[in-house]
Amino acid sequence: MPQTKRTPAGEALSGLILDLFRLNSLLFTSGDRLVAGLGLTSARWQILGAIVTAERPQPVAWLARDLGAARQNVQRIVNDLERDGLVTFETNPHHRRAQLVVLTDKGRQAFDAAMRLQLPWVNNLADGLSLKDIETMAHVVTTLRGRLENGEEPAERG
């Protein structure tokens, strides 16, 4: 028999998901304001961060996978970053058509400047929150993301 009602946990999670949607929008808006003076947007900053985190040049498809984003969207942003001299493309010895994205010195400087701006912003945002609550939230988000990435989402029931 199909479920007709959310469980208490399902109801709470549904509310949390709606709040996370709103939070994501607010984070992007706030991030855009924070890094606008650097000629960046939150989306560009996010891509630069993925490149830095990767620690070695990767193709756009891999960056998109790491970000959980559509390859076409990441490609568009990477093309903009390349046009502005923040990244460059190098030949991929393993795949002729999938060029590697490489951070330039200008890109590294822009990312580092963004992170310097982020430091007081994130510390102020965290003010008054307990480390335990932040760690619990991080655990919940990581668990949910893992379930969705691994295809553990529940099958639709008719």
Language model: regions and residue ranges:
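C-terminal regulatory/oligomerization modules of transcriptional regulators
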Residues: 1-8, 131-158
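Alpha-helical linker/hinge and terminal dimerization helices associated
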Residues: 23, 27-30, 34, 67, ...
